[in-house]
Structure formats: structure tokens, C-alpha cells
């Protein structure tokens, strides 16, 4: 592995290539895609990205579809709230 500095972090592997602004954008994406998320089924911090859009929990072995870079997207959250609201109006 290439040596990374404190300032550039995970994108230190690119060295001086591609420009600073592009490396900053890639840094944000790579940090979110490699981090662990809280599993919505077991509640542990063990949800990891398997491939693009597929997230699997190491503890309870559940696999779910999510965002490409993050586990839960803002669009998914708005759809979830809309479905919940429609269910509540249907029950009443």
C-alpha cells in the first residue's frame, strides 16, 4: 500500500494525479462506501457494502439493496415515509 498522509487520507493512493478537487470528491465517496453502518434488523454496526448497491450484515447475514455509496439514501427515506403515511390513511 502507498503511504497516506493525515491530510489526504484514503485518496493518498492517487498521489498527485487527477487534481485536488476531484480527489476531494472521491474521498467523500470512498469514506462513505467503506464505512460500517448500523443494521436495521439486528441493530449492530456491521452493515458493509458488498458490491454497488448491495449491503450485507456480517452479524445477522441479511442482505439488502441500498444506495451505491451509502446504505440509506434520501430518496429511500422519503419513499419509506410516504408508504408509512399511506398505510396509516388506509387503516383509518
UniProtKB/Swiss-Prot annotation:
Record keywords: Metal-binding, Ribonucleoprotein, Ribosomal protein, Zinc, Zinc-finger
Pfam family, one: Ribosomal_L37ae
GO cellular component: cytosolic large ribosomal subunit; cytosolic ribosome
Entry keyword annotation includes Chaperone: no
GO molecular function: structural constituent of ribosome; zinc ion binding
Zinc finger C4-type: from-to: 39-60
BP terms from Gene Ontology: cytoplasmic translation
Family: Belongs to the eukaryotic ribosomal protein eL43 family.
PANTHER family, sorted: 60S RIBOSOMAL PROTEIN L37A, LARGE RIBOSOMAL SUBUNIT PROTEIN EL43
Name this protein carries in UniProt: Large ribosomal subunit protein eL43
Organism placement in taxonomy: Eukaryota, Metazoa, Ecdysozoa, Arthropoda, Hexapoda
Gene: RpL37A
